[in-house]
A protein has these predicted regions:
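Metal-centered catalytic cores of metalloenzymes
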Residues: 2-7, 20-21, 25-84, 88-149
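N-terminal export leaders
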Residues: 8-18
Length: 149
C-alpha cells in the first residue's frame, strides 16, 4: 500500500516542524542556564555570629559563556556594609578566599562577571558562598551558600 501525502497532511507536518524548531532554542537555552539562590545570615558565618541581618541572593550562570549575573539584597546589618563578594571554593562550614567582588556594598546589588572554567565548575558543585562584611564583623556579618535551584 502506497500513501500519497495530501495537502492537509503536508500542512499539518509543516506546522509540527515549525512548532518544534521554534521551541528548540528555548529548550537548549534553558539547559544552558543554571539558577542559584542563597539565604544570608550570621548563623551561616564561619564561625557563626549573633548578627540579626539577613539577605537573599538570586544568580544565573550561562553555562555556554560562563557569565554569572546576580542580584542580592540585605537588611538589618549592624552598620553599613564595607565589602561584599563571592568566596570559593568552599563547602558549607569552610572558608575560602574572594572569588568575585560585588560592584557595590550597598543593597540592592546587581552584578555580572565572566567566570573561569574552574570557577564555574566550583559554583556548579556548590562550593561558592556570598559574604557581606561590616565594621562590626570584618570577617563577615552574613553569609549564604549558593544552592542550585
Amino acid at each position: 500500500m502506497h500513501l500519497i501525502p495530501t495537502p492537509l497532511f503536508r500542512r499539518t507536518l509543516l506546522t509540527a516542524v515549525l512548532a518544534w524548531t521554534s521551541t528548540a532554542p528555548l529548550i537548549v537555552s534553558a539547559a544552558d542556564t543554571a539558577t542559584f539562590t542563597a539565604t544570608l545570615s550570621g548563623a551561616a558565618e564561619v564561625p557563626a555570629n549573633t548578627a540579626v541581618g539577613t539577605g537573599s541572593l538570586e544568580a544565573k550562570l550561562d553555562k555556554s559563556t560562563n557569565q554569572l549575573t546576580w542580584s542580592v539584597t540585605f537588611i538589618g546589618l549592624t552598620g553599613p556594609a564595607t565589602m561584599a563578594h563571592f568566596h570559593g571554593p568552599a563547602m558549607p562550614g569552610a572558608n575560602a578566599g574572594v572569588a568575585v567582588p560585588f560592584p557595590s556594598a550597598v543593597s540592592p546589588v546587581e552584578g555580572k562577571a565572566t567566570l573561569t572554567p574552574a570557577q564555574a565548575a566550583d559554583l556548579l558543585a556548590g562550593k561558592w558562598y556570598a559574604n557581606v562584611h561590616t565594621a562590626a564583623n570584618p570577617g563577615g556579618e552574613i553569609r549564604g551558600q549558593l544552592m542550585l535551584k
